[in-house]
Amino acid sequence: PQIAMANSLGMRVIVTDHHEVPYIEENGERKEQLPPALAVVDPKRADDTYPFSGICGGVVALKLIQAITEKTGNPGLVNIQEELLEFAALSTVCDVMELKDENRILVKEGLKRIQKGYNEGLKALMEVNDIAPDRLSAYHLGFVLGPCLNATGRLDTAKRALELLQSFTRADAMTAARELKDLNESRKNLTVQGIQRADEYIQEHHMAEDKVMVIYLPEVHESIAGIIAGKVREKYHHPVFILTKGEDGVKGSGRSIEAYHMYDAMTQVKEYFTKYGGHKLAAGLSMREEDIEPLRAALNKKCTLTEDDFIPKVHIDVAMPMGYADDALAGEFALLEPFGTGNPRPLFAQKGLVFQAGFKMGANKTCARFRVKTPEGTTQTVVFFGDLEKLGAFLDEKYGVGSEEVLYAGKGNFPLSVVYQVSQNTYKGKTEVQFVMQNYC
């Protein structure tokens, strides 16, 4: 309706997007439903010839600027493109695009610009989060800087993030950065509460048998629905929709598993939505409250997932003794960065690692360092940033109640098979190989 109105007023509209194009099926063929704009720039269009369709919305906008630059020859736009590179990197990582092909180069070069501190706002945001420029990685974009920038739009107004990025003085940037960090802490607390409420809802509504979880949490802020959906998806390994009460009906976000194309599944039941859109693994929607239970029933009726699809699978690159990883090998892995979705850090595995001692680390003791003895007779240090409570329960179940306490007392003798990553850790000017445990059994 908005574009039609703009057209009626003599305005010309260009739409940029990167989501799947809405479609209807007629006689077994998909017919895309495009808005009546002057141009619709979307690499997901069936007739689009751009060689890489996996770019985010921010990069699509950057491509439009590049096209305008080529057409007009405006030299000022050339400089703008370079300045926008760091924001293209941020948007690529924060929208969970695969870090391959063009995206990998965009993020790699964007990280270099952020490290050099061209933008006062990003430099300040790194400082308040204790991120040294030379340690900056795609992880920090997606899990530290990005959430701080998004928190203001989720809980307040996105203008505050924009003001940070437009700061010209260090003083203004630091003030804005501290405010965003505080807002993100509030967002984290609300997210934890939302996850707890989602767990309660699953139990109360007997959703253990549902293949697709449709969870209605009216009291949850709509801006954090996607984060909660992602956390619940990780825990249960099911497709998840988190619905909340919006200003005009119900709004929600979905997060899916690899075997379930969420956007296609939603298209099959689109009569329940007033608006929807998204990708294979993530989606957003608006709907009427009275249609929540019918939607839950319809999605589950049409779902063809099997029990095997709900079992998380860990795919390692190769089984490798920890003793094989030296400084040279760890340095070569660094050449493969930036790591992230679509370009994960290599995964290795070794059996028979005997856990002898453990030491909890961090301000809240939420991570740990373990001393392990390898089958080759060497001693290695393994760090773990996962769920320590879950690890402790696993040890107590496998080796008897009290095993966790024995391990942290330095008297452990618990053989485990471990999936791990190899990285480099620099502390007080000294760089050494670090083994990061990802899974265990």
Where are these regions (language model features)?
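Hydrophobic helix-and-loop "lid/oligomerization" segment in the mid-to-C-terminal part
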Residues: 9-10, 28, 36, 70-297, ...
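Acidic, glycine-enriched active-site microenvironments
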Residues: 5, 9-10, 15, 23-24, ...
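Short, conserved micro-motifs enriched in small and acidic residues
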Residues: 51-59, 222-227
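Short gly/pro/ser/thr-enriched loop/turn and capping motifs at secondary-structure boundaries
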Residues: 19-24, 30-32, 47-49, 247-250, ...
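A short, charged helix-loop
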Residues: 20-21, 36-49, 60-69
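N-terminal small/polar loop signature for handling phosphorylated ligands or for N-terminal nucleophile
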Residues: 1-33, 40-43, 197, 223, ...
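General beta-strand structural signal in soluble alpha/beta enzymes
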Residues: 14-18, 41-42, 215-216, 242-243, ...
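Mid-to-C-terminal polyanion-binding domains and interfaces
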Residues: 170-178, 182-216, 268-441
